[in-house]
């Protein structure tokens, strides 16, 4: 029961104040919720269920879950799927998990929780808009649509910016830590993504890191906590809409 309570608290804290206000205002009726709340609730449920299922399947033949009952395996899989996106608790030794499970946890960490919550990461809504933008491109649609609503193009641009900044910093930091410490890319990426997503999970290599690697992780934590758009806007000049625009021309992509 303790693990279930912890998971419930993590989910509550990861949804965001906007969602809870919307739920209370509309008395929990899903069809009356704002698009933001619908995306958060739907994608959060998808991440929790799919994440737990994949971890469970990956660890069937793994060493960490050996000797445990089916119910314990399901609970541990569910717990790690929930906690990977924000809280950073672990009921199993993450270093003993299969590489597939570790990589999945990395993906969950970088997606993170939802805007206005206690969680870090790219955020669920940002990642969904990023995916929907890709899907609309494949379908050759001029607009991004979700739950019978159209998403503004500026929101899509910001989503791509956030995802790009997180990925570039994560990859660069991973390569640096791996080169400095002589550890595998998987271990280095786990630590770096955990830092930038402000999760706190580790495979156990953090205590032995050099000062340089620790500084890299600290900078990632600061970036992840402050937010990519906040930092970007802080160092960018104020942009005024011009009265005239340059001629537009198409270029070949891909």
Describe each PLM feature range:
Residues 1-254:
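Membrane-proximal intracellular helices of multi-pass ion channels
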């Amino acid at each position: 029961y303790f693990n279930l309570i912890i998971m419930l608290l993590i989910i509550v804290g990861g949804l965001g104040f906007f969602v809870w206000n919307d739920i209370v205002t509309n008395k929990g009726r899903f069809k009356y919720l704002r698009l933001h709340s619908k995306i958060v609730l739907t994608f959060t449920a998808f991440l929790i269920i799919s994440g737990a299922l994949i971890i469970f399947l990956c660890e069937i033949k793994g060493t960490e879950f050996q000797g445990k009952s089916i119910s314990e395996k399901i609970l541990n899989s569910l717990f790690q799927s929930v906690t990977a996106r924000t809280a950073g608790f672990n009921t199993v030794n993450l270093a003993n998990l299969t590489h597939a499970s570790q990589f999945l946890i990395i993906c969950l960490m970088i997606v993170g929780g939802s805007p206005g919550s206690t969680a870090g990461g790219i955020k669920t809504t940002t990642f969904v808009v990023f995916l929907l933008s890709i899907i609309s491109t494949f379908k050759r649609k001029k607009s991004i649509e979700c739950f019978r609503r159209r998403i503004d193009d500026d929101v899509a641009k910001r989503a791509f910016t956030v995802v790009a900044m997180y990925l570039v910093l994560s990859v660069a930091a991973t390569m640096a830590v791996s080169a400095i410490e002589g550890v595998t890319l998987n271990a280095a990426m786990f630590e770096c993504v955990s830092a930038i997503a402000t999760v706190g999970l580790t495979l156990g290599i953090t205590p032995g890191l050099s000062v340089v690697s620790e500084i890299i992780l600290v900078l990632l934590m600061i970036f992840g906590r402050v937010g990519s758009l906040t930092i970007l806007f802080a160092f960018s000049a104020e942009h005024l809409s011009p009265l005239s625009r340059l001629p537009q021309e198409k270029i070949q992509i891909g």
